């Protein structure tokens, strides 16, 4: 059964609302490009996207000391771009030992033939970029 972007949006929004209750000091933005409102994902794609967004937001809350987290869904050429960006402490991506969370994020996105990129530097925050082929 397919998962609409609206279904995914509700799940992510509910997760963010719960996170807000736990950490009041963080400002969340959740943006979906109106041109992709009607797309849907297979249940495997939808669940993997949800879990990766959840992990990225969780990492921002737990490790980044961020005051702002933005989740942004957009259409770019022939893929859907999902960006999770925080203004936290960042990390040196070259020297960090990847934990299970990041490993699992990459594995989940590979499963749906997507790409995952993490860009971070100390004191500049972290951006997790997910690209999922648009059917």
Residue ranges, per PLM feature:
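Glycine-rich G1-box
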Residues: 89
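Short beta-strand/loop element within the Bergerat-fold HATPase_c
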Residues: 68-78
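ATP phosphate-binding glycine-rich loop and adjacent ATP-lid/helix-beta elements
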Residues: 94-129
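Acidic ATP/Mg2+-coordinating residue in the GHKL
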Residues: 86
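A short coil/beta-turn micro-motif at the C-terminal edge
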Residues: 77, 122-124, 134
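Conserved ATP-binding N-box helix of the HATPase_c
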Residues: 46-68
């Amino acid at each position: 059964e397919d998962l609409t972007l609206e279904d995914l949006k509700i799940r992510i929004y509910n997760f963010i609302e719960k996170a807000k209750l736990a950490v009041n000091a963080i400002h969340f933005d959740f943006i979906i490009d109106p041109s992709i409102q009607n797309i849907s994902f297979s249940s495997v794609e939808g669940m993997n996207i949800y879990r990766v967004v959840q992990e990225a937001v969780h990492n921002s809350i737990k490790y980044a000391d961020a005051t702002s987290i933005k989740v942004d869904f957009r259409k770019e050429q022939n893929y859907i771009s999902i960006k999770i960006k925080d203004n936290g402490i960042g990390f040196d991506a070259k020297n960090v030992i990847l934990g299970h969370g990041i490993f699992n994020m990459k594995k989940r996105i590979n499963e749906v033939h997507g790409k995952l990129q993490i860009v971070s530097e100390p004191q500049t925050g972290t951006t997790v970029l997910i690209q999922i082929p648009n059917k």
